[in-house]
Amino acid sequence: MGNINKKLFYFLIQLITILIVLSDDSYNSLLPLEKDIAVIIRDLSPQTNPDFEIDNPNRVIKGLVKDQLNEEDRSPIYCCGDDHAPNIDRNRFVIHNQSTFYSWFHNQKDVNIVISKSLVFTRNVTSDDPRIYSYESDNFFPIDKMGFEADSYNGPIKKNQWKDRWGFPRNFHFCLELHASFFYIGGELFSFKGDDDVWVFIDNRLVLDLGAPHDVSGQNGQGSVYLDNLGLEKSKSYNFDFFYCERHTTDSHIMVETSIDFKCKYYDYCGVCEGMGKCCNPSECYGSLPACGHFECPGLTDIAPNVDWRYHCKVVVPNCSLSDTFCVKHQCDPDSKQCVPSTDYQPCQGKSNSSCIEARCDDKMGGCYLKSKPKDQSKNDTTCYRETCNEDTSTWEYKALCEDDSDKCISKKCIPNSGCSSSVVDCNDNNHCTIDSCSKDTGCIHDPIENCVPCVEGNKCSESSDKCQQLECNPYNSTTECIDRTKKNCDDSNACTIDTCNGESGECENTPKQCLAKNKCSTARCNSKTGQCDNIYHCDDGILCTLDKCSENGTCYYEANPCDDGDQCTIDICLNTLTETGGCSHSARVCEPKNSCFTSHCDKKLGCVQTPIECPVEAFCLISFCDNSTKKCMTADRPCIPDDPRCQYGVCDNDTKACIFKDYDPLPFKCQSAAVKAAVGVGAGAAAGIAIGGAIALGLAAFGGKRGYDAWKSSRDNQIQTSSENPLYNPNPNQGDNPLYAANNS
């Protein structure tokens, strides 16, 4: 037997074994030749959205969407708000704004038409990873004669105006989205090549960014994601979200290759795999509403897919009391259906008994507090002025305390921060021939003395060195006698002054006591009755729930009292009415779970802590989890992860409560033992192509020759693109000898 015939013999033995194994239905169901992947397509038009047929930069532009997916509706978030998306220069752009971008992936009446489709992914039997599936088309027009191009469409959009490079009318302008989930096993990849915009999110993170219209020449419009580089956790379920738009003539290309095992956790009521209910518009809901009620969309899985959701909307009446505070009560506005502050609620009414003092309310300041109308700061010395409110004008009026002239025998003046200084009017006219007295009504009186003798020359009575102790001539005998008058009285009836008489001038001196202020925000004052110093603190605003502060430069400022007790499980508030506790109140904090997938409890140090719920599971080979989109517990098959997922797959056994790992059969050539590779005797590269290339195809090739293989290829709708994929046509695949080529061409 020649060398070629020996190789062929060993190969046919191996091939027969493969054919027998592939007849096993369990293996075929594990890795079917085809998978239908559900997608949603929105037909758009340059007439409804100017982002389509926009100037073509013919290059990928990154950063058109944000790195994080909008988890509320699993849609990409436009990068730039109301601004244009950037392009290669300032004068051109590829997206107008967030409003035009919105209709790419959201239902919008008269702007887009929603079409449900599925893409058939085919297992790549020539790959060294049996999990690889691909979808490829160089004429990707999945909604030709649909949407705006459908015969039944009678709207304003012009039909059949966009043609491909061969002149055939095509439905060029659409956006596609695919939502699924997967259990990360290890070794998965996702590759794409095509036009135009493509974004891929895994675990809500952007992992492939191919934005803007572009062609597929060279490396343009292609990229790959290796999931092992994403920091994913094996056996954990992750969301997968794929977005694709065809925005520009004249070609449409798509090539997707992936080993990710897509699953659909649920279908929403719109019939979309892992959809977020985008078909729902609450304004279209059917039913009656209370005065302040409004409609909300149903829960994603509350009704069966494609059931008319308009009859199943939720009626929601807002509980406005949840927004109430001490100062603000809320009520529902029937027009806006929103909670708004009540204009009738006056919590501080009657709290003030003066029109010069306003009763105000501020929750940060503890509720009701009193605020004075503006005062004259030049008259704020209460030792000199008494303030009163003019209730008619609601203004402060001031009366000087030391300007009382009802007693003309008493002289009064105000000493700042010490009060009134009162002294007896000095009625001495220095005339010994008068009797000096004082009337409180008229003041000083000087009555002449009859038969008064003038002072003789040389009388020394007026030459006293102490002018506070006055001497004057005896009006009846002025020769030698002097009359000693009473020492001058300098008592001003104010305990805050030191009263003395200046002997040289004879004037009274009433010197204020020195009182020192404690800080720059205080004024030192003396009590005119006791003579004791008092400190008047200007920063006391009289509000229990504020902390009165004084800055270094003497400016008063006020901080809300936090009443912090150091316990994160209490709600600490301050109310001015709680005088017994200094205003502070500490009520228990109620921790609400953020959704039905969580429970919540309070930790004194951390506050409210969210804990995922444990969903019940009925068997070892099932796992359960709470889905963040539906907020419900779901069940899935337990993933069994082999050491090398490209060579083995895992099967869960409920009886043994263990995962069983089996080799793929036929085993990919890269996974074969050295003995098998030697027995086949084919170069490693060629054998890889032959062994994994599909046992059915190889069987036809081996036993039916070229014609049998070509007939099978034709029956598969040209899924194999070139004749060179037939091993009978390739003498040296990957630099190795092909025994089938030699045997069929000898």
Curated annotation (Swiss-Prot):
Ranges of compositional bias, category Polar residues: 717-746
Cytoplasmic face residues: 701-746
Cross-referenced InterPro entries: Fibro_Slime, PA14/GLEYA, PA14_dom, Prespore-cell_inducing_factor, S_mold_repeat
Compartment annotation: Membrane
Protein topology in the membrane: Single-pass type I membrane protein
Endpoints of the signal sequence: 1-23
UniProt domain PA14: residue ranges: 125-276
Keyword annotations of the record: Glycoprotein, Membrane, Signal, Transmembrane, Transmembrane helix
UniProt xrefs under NCBIfam families: Fibro_Slime (TIGR02148)
The name this protein goes by in its record: Protein psiN
Species, as recorded: Dictyostelium discoideum
